[in-house]
């Protein structure tokens, strides 16, 4: 079992229950899923690009991603409805906890010019989204084997009711948020 999951069950639940005054442990916010999304606009002209992006996301997540398609045609972007334009994967359970552990302890410290995550990136319902400019911050990606540096979006979906609860939950896992000056 992942260390972060044990930390959550053993200490974080008790801390948050005390901090927010919950009567039941079931009211304590928890991480429900982590979604990784890689939009690949170049896939319109070259199908191999989408294949490389899928391989990168598979290596990062340990799970096969699905291909996302355009919902409607946009002439300005030269895309038609149904064109494959990206790839995404949703992590839950054990894989989610292991990915979160690798993200916090290994990948985030490898980001160039990193000064902390923006605490304002919550959506109003306790879910946190962040963008990564380079997929090479993940140790599973070998620099020599990638065709191009791509970014990806990471969304952490929680059961928190508001941003304050979500921030408290992720801070309990030692997420490196920027400190208010």
Swiss-Prot record:
Function: This is one of the proteins that bind and probably mediate the attachment of the 5S RNA into the large ribosomal subunit, where it forms part of the central protuberance. In the 70S ribosome it contacts protein S13 of the 30S subunit (bridge B1b), connecting the 2 subunits; this bridge is implicated in subunit movement. Contacts the P site tRNA; the 5S rRNA and some of its associated proteins might help stabilize positioning of ribosome-bound tRNAs.
One of the record's GO cellular component terms: ribosome
The name this protein goes by in its record: Large ribosomal subunit protein uL5
GO biological process: translation
Subunit structure comment from the entry: Part of the 50S ribosomal subunit; part of the 5S rRNA/L5/L18/L25 subcomplex. Contacts the 5S rRNA and the P site tRNA. Forms a bridge to the 30S subunit in the 70S ribosome.
Entry annotated with the keyword tRNA-binding: yes
Keywords noted in UniProt: Ribonucleoprotein, Ribosomal protein, RNA-binding, rRNA-binding, tRNA-binding
Pfam families linked: Ribosomal_L5, Ribosomal_L5_C
Single GO MF descriptor: structural constituent of ribosome
Domain of life assignment: Bacteria
Family as reported in the entry's similarity comment: Belongs to the universal ribosomal protein uL5 family.
């Amino acid at each position: 079992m992942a260390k972060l999951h044990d930390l959550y069950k053993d200490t974080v639940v008790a801390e948050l229950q005390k901090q927010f005054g919950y009567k039941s442990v079931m009211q304590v916010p928890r991480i429900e899923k982590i979604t990784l999304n890689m939009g690949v606009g170049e896939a319109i002209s070259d199908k191999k690009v989408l294949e490389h992006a899928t391989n990168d996301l598979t290596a990062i997540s340990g799970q096969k991603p699905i291909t996302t398609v355009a919902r409607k045609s946009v002439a300005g972007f030269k895309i038609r409805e149904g064109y494959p334009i990206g790839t995404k994967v949703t992590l839950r359970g054990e894989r989610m906890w292991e990915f979160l552990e690798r993200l916090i302890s290994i990948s985030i410290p490898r980001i160039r010019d990193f000064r902390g995550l923006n605490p304002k990136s919550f959506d109003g319902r306790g879910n946190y989204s962040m963008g990564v400019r380079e997929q090479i911050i993940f140790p599973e990606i070998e620099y020599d084997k990638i065709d191009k540096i791509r970014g990806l979006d990471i969304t952490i979906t929680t059961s928190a009711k508001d941003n304050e609860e979500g921030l408290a939950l992720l801070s309990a896992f030692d997420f490196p948020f920027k400190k208010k000056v």
